[in-house]
Amino acid sequence: MLSYGIPEFRLPKSLVAKELENITDLGVDLETNVVIGRSLTVDDLFARGFDAVFLGTGAGLPNFLRIPGENLLGVYSANEFLTRVNLMKGYKKGEVPTPVKVGKRVAVVGAGNVAMDAARTAKRLGAEEVYIVYRRGAEEVPARKEEVEHAKEEGVIFKLLNNP
């Protein structure tokens, strides 16, 4: 999740790699990119001799709104969008070719930290207008205040008290 779901501008991939190296240097065994319950179970890990198991579950499944059009091409959950950008190196726009296409106008429904990341990423990938669409008022936005301020500084437009 650290490498795929968080934008480069918030958490550089080189820092994640260094921190993982620091952890393994302490003698911690890491099993990354494993789907617990499919390729490996917790019981399998204990059978391998592990005394403790930490399950870093990452982000949960997205909540879709069940509205017409949400299954159209170009409609993603924020986590899927961020993962696509990270895996396809979209954060290196101009340096590497990437198949991540962002429209001229982008709407991000929701106002949490992940929504701010998605909006700021879309803006950085060239979207001319990026909107945060949120059903509640400014005082109820769940994102950290500094994340909201960064989004506004980068030109993200907030449409509050709106519900698609």
Could you describe each region identified by the protein language model?
Residues 1-164:
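Residues forming the flavin
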